[in-house]
Amino acid sequence: AGHGSFLHDENAVTYLAEAVAKLGNHTFPLVISDSVAEFLSAVAEETGLDFDPASPDLDGTLRKLGSIARIVGATLRDTANPTMLKAGYKANVIPQTAEAVIDCRVVPGRQAEFEREVDELIGPNVEREWITALDSYETTFDGHLVDAMNAAVLAHDENGRTVPYMLSGGTDAKAFAKLGIRCFGFAPLKLPPELDFAALFHGVDERVPVESLEFGTQVLEHFLLHS
């Protein structure tokens, strides 16, 4: 700590700002998990697009998916998005400490490598700790529940197809997995093609069309009554 009018070789805000910028601008390596591979294969069959992991323009191909490209892209690699900053108590005082919160989403099986990369990026002047630490979770797409999901969708949309995907957001599946319970995300919505649904998440106008909810309710009712 010290007076803001003096020269300072060490500044917690500067150290933190540099670390946060490096993390926020870093692109983690491409990782295709089994679930994502199955999803891309199914989408390729339906759209004719070629999702070749070796392609230098894989991200460009993903953009052709439209509004879901950001969701799918977030499952192909780890992400570390700065969301909160805290430092200082007065404009003319150099603070002793500075803190940042980084929203990290790690592809299953990448935890150790992710932490190593983060440590290299933030450097020796910044310490890190996990606020919440639960391993990423993935299961195989099979079993009677999967069959019941598919049957429920087909009962209300004869052109529907149930495919696995990986959710970059957090769910209770991470906790249930520790108890040996397999979890699947199943929230069927029939959305208008022009709606950028992902852009509404945690936004000022977050919403879902009533018709989409009605469809989802019918599918879930069928699922619960027949599974």
Predicted regions and their residues:
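Metal-dependent amide/peptide-bond hydrolase catalytic core
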Residues: 1-215, 221, 225
